[in-house]
Curated annotation (Swiss-Prot):
Record's subunit section: In plastids the minimal PEP RNA polymerase catalytic core is composed of four subunits: alpha, beta, beta', and beta''. When a (nuclear-encoded) sigma factor is associated with the core the holoenzyme is formed, which can initiate transcription.
Residues binding Zn(2+), per UniProt: 233, 308, 315, 318
SUPFAM superfamilies: beta and beta-prime subunits of DNA dependent RNA-polymerase
Function: DNA-dependent RNA polymerase catalyzes the transcription of DNA into RNA using the four ribonucleoside triphosphates as substrates.
Signal peptide extent: none
Protein name: DNA-directed RNA polymerase subunit beta''
Naturally occurring in which organism (per UniProt): Pinus koraiensis
Subcellular location: Plastid, Chloroplast
Cofactor: Zn(2+)
Length: 1209
């Protein structure tokens, strides 16, 4: 009301009040600024100051009368907070599961967590404002939060909403949010995290304030001599500014940039339909700016401090209007110091702010396109490509404009998705109203920085990967690899043990050992000190018990108590055989006695007994004897063999006969020239101890031949019975004898039927996959590293054989499961209407195969003993189909397959954890525990394939881009980086690329000489504009508006120096000397000799140390060096700047007190008419005022093209 009464009083003075608006509303800080600006335009500075004094007095009086205070009852929490927090926790739980399954890596999980909780916090803040407005609009907390004073909604939100996300001392966001507010109180963990943010705010206030003050000093230092000294410099150059900028918040919303035009001066006439609406050198006000915005779609040519010709000064028209009033800047104004203070002051003041939530995680990065109504979405799938979002969600990327159609119940709408956008829905998917269907990339990218995130292994085991990797270029000879495309890295569980500590002779692939004593026991045994004493053999030396079967150490005799097991005997010369690896075979060292049971058996060189269902290849097992380094008789199973004692020249090869002995001595000729593998045989040892129970140790050999590579496995277990239960024979000539091997959790690879283990801590040795023979260590799979899952408990298969077969349970389909191969002996086990096939039932009347074999490469082959034919039966992925009696099908699994967690491969429950299939039974699988890790493209892998890693080792290093915080506290280093022209900023990196692009285009039109010349100039002008935009982006992110002309003055000084090159400068300037650009141009025109130089982008510190005044330089930095150098060079300081005159106590060359008669003409140019010789001035300016110019035909055509738009206008 006081403002209105004041306006009525002034109305009597007959001032034009017709266009004055009537303000009758609550006004915040922004509205007050607009009001003051309008008051200055209409009344001037004097009257406006009186009005503001009355506003100030009225404001203090009303605040004193109201006496607003805060109480704890005024802190009201929004009722929707409970379900908002619960929903955010549920989303976080889903992200945690996806990370555990390997679908998200740690960085994507962190991004999701931060965005979820930031969105929850922001939504709760909006709910807080709505709650106050509806329930208690005069709440003191609500009134203070919108007063524009010290408090704001962010601080009130921490009182009544939720504290939200905090930052650690390094400025990184902590992914654990504070769910409570200060009214509810904090838990211990939340209090500690809250102290991080509070401490960061206190430290930043102290440290950043000094940094901002020093930045202000450097900015003022570099531009202190810039003063307005003339009205018009006569330049015809400028920059183009578009009054309209495209889509920002919404694709249909046009954001108008009229503020950039207000206060500027036109560099050229503006025409619309041959009608001039604005002339050159005319300043732009609010009315003209709105007019240009509405009717001028093309960019507007305006004057800028970049192109002012005044040397170390600036003119009125290149600067434009003053920021304090609506007139041109006055002569004598020290605009340089004003520019430095305008940029540095917001940084000094805004360091008092503490934003703990980090404004980077808002929706400003990308725009979202939402569905207008419910319906089905349709688009062309051939125009999109699958990809992943920054949060790990699947999406489609479109490179060009994509047209999508939303078909609703009663309406159809077409939308166009811009290029490089992400489509978040699938084709023919039903979408709901307001559902996000696409994400449009922002036109202007935010500040980003590359960050390395290390992923550590959660368990001990062996590294495998399922994606393409290559050597990183900087680590060609190391173990660092680079990911070529997104894939998984697996850590297969297993423990690594050193064989130098544990004396074990058979630490080879698939050995079973006792894993419990590894961590507690140690031995120092002597292998070469064994003597024979009265039939007993003992090892002398310091020895502790390592394995469970090491207690039986006397009179060990080879025994073969069960049929169908292979045993090797040697001549009774008491040779001690050494272990020797030959042709990928492992040889077991044995000794023999002449007695077997109660009979005396002759010992030929080699006798092999093999079960009828097994197949043996000729000359596949060799025995080696070393006569020179023989060891006396005695068992040495508990001591490691010294492989160095065996030399190739001393080895005695024992040939194996070409016949196989059956149980009754029946001779059957072995088929020659075949690739028949030895599937499984048994070596039995009967260890008799004097004062202990009778026990046996069985050594099982598994040999699988795949692609001409033979893999061997040795299994050692201490049992009371052989590891396999053998079925009886009804016919000697039949081949329907089958093994039965079920798996239990105690010993994963032995029978749980008749065999009972004495040791309960059995483990299996797993060879290293990298192919390196490491005798110092080996990996052991303990029972905790593997688990068993039952596939189908109630699956039934029916036999069509005779009645005697049906009565025998062992005559059913019994599948032998090896660790690397399967031997299936089937005799009429399927009806003629069913057979094992690839996911479907074949037609009837198929022949029944009796034997088939599945090798390591998951290839199932058929073997016919009569014809000796191996045929490929099924593909890599196989399953068995049931008949009408068996309704269920087996899942498609294969040996070595890596299966993620929660995959349904069983009818009872999903897979409890991720793993690798290492054994397949008819109704169960043995799975080795594993952990998948997602690795994106260009990530770094530390280690080789098959390398053993401990828990906590660095596994992957992810390289990703992180948005820098838009907080001014974090933004000040960015402003400093840009102002100092550091080498790693985007401006310096883009200079060379921009120059090369412009050179290629200009050379085609103007030739090589002028192409390079103009390209260098255009590149520098573009870098200047880009540098201004980058600095503005930091301040505008916090709502701080700084005039572009202030930053342009700073950038002008940063680009005002050139570097003299070495060509042809011996008589003029020294090579490498920094001089002013205007000085180089004047000297080039005055001298006949051409001066070669290149433009430079200097930082504000370096630019301050390269000025014309050595007094100013010495007062800034490096005083002794600057003064000594100036004395040696004989420099003269002409005291043209403000700083040097202040130091010496002289009169400063600035001030606006002088009176100047203003006329309608400036330098003989009427601003209403413009310059008639504008084109000639432009041509001279392009050539840097070169007088001697020879034009070629290409140049003449270029200038003719330039003349055309001017003639038309």
């Amino acid at each position: 009301m006081k403002i209105w009464r004041f306006l009525l009083m002034k109305k009597q003075t007959r001032l034009p009040f017709d266009n004055l608006p009537f303000y009758n509303k609550v006004m915040d800080k922004t509205a007050i600024k607009k009001l003051i600006s309008r008051l200055i335009d209409h009344f001037g500075m004097t009257y406006t100051s009186h009005i503001l004094d009355q506003l100030k007095t009225s404001g203090f009086k009303q605040a004193t009368d109201t006496a607003i205070s805060l109480g704890i009852d005024d802190l009201l929490t929004a009722p929707s907070k409970g379900w908002l927090v619960q929903d955010a926790e549920q989303q976080g739980s889903v992200s945690e599961k996806q990370n555990h399954y390997g679908n998200l890596h740690a960085v994507e999980k962190l991004r999701q967590s931060i965005e979820i909780w930031y969105a929850t916090s922001e939504y709760l803040r909006k709910e807080m404002n709505t709650n106050f407005s509806m329930t208690d609009p005069l709440n003191p907390v609500h009134v203070m939060s919108f007063s524009g004073a010290r408090g704001n909604t962010s601080q009130v939100h921490q009182l009544v909403g939720m504290r939200g996300l905090m930052s650690d001392p390094q400025g990184q966001i902590i992914d654990l949010p504070i769910r409570r507010n200060l009214r509810e109180g904090l838990s211990l963990t939340e209090y500690i995290i809250s102290c991080y943010g509070a401490r960061k705010g206190v430290v930043d206030t102290a440290v950043r304030t000094a940094d901002a003050g020093y930045l202000t000093r450097r900015l003022v230092e570099v531009v202190q001599q810039i003063v307005v000294r003339r009205t018009d410099c006569g330049t015809v150059q400028g920059i183009f500014v578009s009054p309209i900028r495209g889509r920002e918040r919404d694709i249909n919303e046009v954001v108008v940039r009229t503020q950039i035009l207000i206060g500027r001066v036109l560099a050229d006439d503006v025409y619309i339909n041959r009608r001039c609406i604005a002339t050159r050198n005319q300043d732009i006000g609010v009315g003209l700016a709105n007019q240009l915005r509405n009717i001028r779609p093309r960019p507007i040519y305006i004057r800028t401090p970049f192109t002012c010709k005044s040397i170390s000064r600036i003119c009125q028209l290149c600067y434009g209007r003053s920021t304090t009033h609506s007139h041109l800047i006055e002569l004598g104004e020290a605009v340089g110091i004003i520019a430095g203070q305008s940029i540095g002051e917001p940084g000094t003041q805004l360091t008092l702010r503490t934003f703990h939530t980090g404004g980077v995680f808002t929706g400003d990065i990308a725009e979202h396109i939402r569905a207008p109504f419910n319906g089905k979405i349709e688009f062309n799938e051939n125009l999109v490509y699958p990809t992943r979002t920054r949060n790990g969600h699947p999406a489609y990327l479109c490179h060009n404009n994509l047209s999508i159609t939303i078909d609703g119940q009663n309406q159809v709408q077409n939308l166009t998705i811009p290029p490089q956008s992400l489509l978040l829905v699938q084709n023919d998917q039903y979408v709901e109203s307001e559902q996000i269907i696409a994400e449009v990339r922002a036109r202007t990218s935010s500040f980003k920085e590359k960050v390395r995130k290390n992923i550590y292994s959660d368990l001990e085991g062996e590294m495998h990967w399922s994606t393409n990797v290559c050597h990183a270029p900087e680590y060609v000879h190391g173990n660092v690899h680079s990911i070529l495309r997104t894939g998984y890295l697996w850590i297969l569980s297993g423990g690594i043990y050193g064989s130098g500590v544990v004396p074990f002779p058979f630490h080879k692939y698939q050995d079973q050992v006792d894993v419990q004593p590894f961590v507690a026991k140690h031995t120092d045994s002597y292998v070469d000190q064994v003597e024979h004493r009265s039939g007993d053999s003992n090892c002398y030396g310091k020895e502790e018990q390592i394995f469970s079967y090491s207690e039986t150490e006397t009179d060990r005799t080879i025994s073969n108590e069960h049929r169908d097991s292979i045993y090797v005997t040697f001549s009774p010369k008491n040779y001690n055989m050494k272990g020797k690896k030959q042709m990928n075979r492992f040889i077991v060292s044995l000794q023999c006695d002449k007695e077997w049971g109660k009979r005396i058996i002759p010992c030929p060189d080699a006798i092999l007994r093999i079960p009828k269902s097994g197949i043996l290849q000729i000359n596949s097992i060799f025995g080696y004897s070393n006569v020179e380094h023989g060891i006396p008789d005695g068992p040495n199973m508990t001591t490691p063999f010294s492989l160095d004692l065996s030399r190739e020249g001393d080895n005695l090869q024992i040939q194996i006969s070409n016949s196989i002995l059956y149980e009754d001595g029946e001779r059957i000729q072995v088929m020659s020239d075949t690739s028949i593998p030895l599937v499984r045989t048994c070596l039995g040892f009967d260890w008799e101890q004097i004062d202990s129970i009778e026990s046996e140790a069985y050594v099982s050999l598994i040999s699988v031949r795949t692609n001409k590579i033979v893999n061997n496995m040795v299994q050692i277990s201490l049992m009371k019975y052989p590891p396999f239960f053998m079925g009886r024979r009804d016919n000697k000539a039949s081949s329907n004898l089958m093994f039965h091997n079920n798996l239990d959790h105690t010993n994963l690879f032995s029978s749980n039927g008749a065999s009972q283990l004495i040791s309960k801590h059995q483990g299996t040795i797993c060879s290293l996959s990298n192919g390196e023979e490491d005798s110092g260590s080996f990996m052991v799979l303990s029972p905790s590293d593997c688990f068993r899952i039952v596939l189908f408990n109630d699956s039934k298969c029916y036999d069509t054989g005779n009645k005697s077969n049906r009565k025998d349970p062992m005559r059913k389909i019994i599948e032998f499961s090896g660790l690397l191969g399967h031997l299936h002996s089937i005799t009429s086990r399927f009806p003629s209407s069913q057979f094992i096939t690839d996911k479907k039932v074949l037609s009837k009347k198929h022949s029944i195969f009796h034997n088939y074999f599945m090798d390591e490469n998951m290839r199932i082959s058929h073997f016919d003993p009569c014809r000796n034919i191996i045929s490929n039966l099924l593909g890599p992925n196989w399953c068995s189909s049931s008949s009408e009696f068996c309704k269920k099908t087996f899942p498609v699994v294969s040996l070595g397959q890596l299966i993620p967690e929660s995959v349904w491969i069983s009818e009872d429950e999903p897979l409890p954890e991720s793993g690798q299939i290492i054994a397949v039974d008819e109704e169960s699988l043995v799975i080795r525990s594993a952990k998948p890790y997602l690795a994106t493209r260009k990530a770094t892998v530390h280690g080789h394939y098959g390398e053993i890693l401990d828990k906590g080792d660095t596994l992957i290093t992810l390289i990703y881009e992180r948005l820098k915080s838009s907080d001014i506290i974090q933004g000040l280093p960015k402003v400093e980086q840009l102002s100092e022209a550091r080498l790693n900023n985007s401006i310096s990196m883009n200079l060379k690329e921009s120059f090369e692009n412009w050179t290629g285009d200009m050379t085609r039109f103007l030739g090589s000489l002028w192409g390079l010349f103009i390209s260098a100039r255009i590149t520098m002008e573009q870098s200047q504009i880009h540098l201004v935009n980058q600095i503005q982006k930091v301040y505008r992110s916090q709502g701080v508006r700084i005039g572009d002309k202030h930053i342009e003055i700073i950038v002008r000084q940063m680009t005002s120096k050139v570097l003299i090159s070495e060509d042809g400068t011996a008589n003029v300037f020294s090579p490498g000397e920094l001089i002013g650009l205007s000085r180089a141009q004047r000297m080039d025109r005055a001298l006949e000799e051409t001066i070669y130089y290149q433009t430079m982008l200097l930082g504000i510190t370096r630019a301050s140390l390269n000025t014309q005044s050595f007094i100013s330089e010495a007062s800034f930095q490096e005083t002794a060096r600057v003064l000594a150098k100036a004395a040696l060079q004989g420099r003269i300081d002409w005291l043209k700047g403000l700083k040097e005159n202040v130091i010496l106590g002289g009169m400063i060359p600035a001030g606006t007190g002088q009176h100047i008669h203003r006329s309608g003409k400036r330098n003989g140019i009427d601003p209403r008419i413009g310059n008639r010789n504008l084109f000639s001035n432009k041509v001279k300016d392009i050539l840097f005022h070169h007088d001697k110019v020879s034009f070629f035909s290409i140049q003449e055509n270029y200038h003719n093209i330039l003349k055309q738009p001017l003639k038309e206008s």
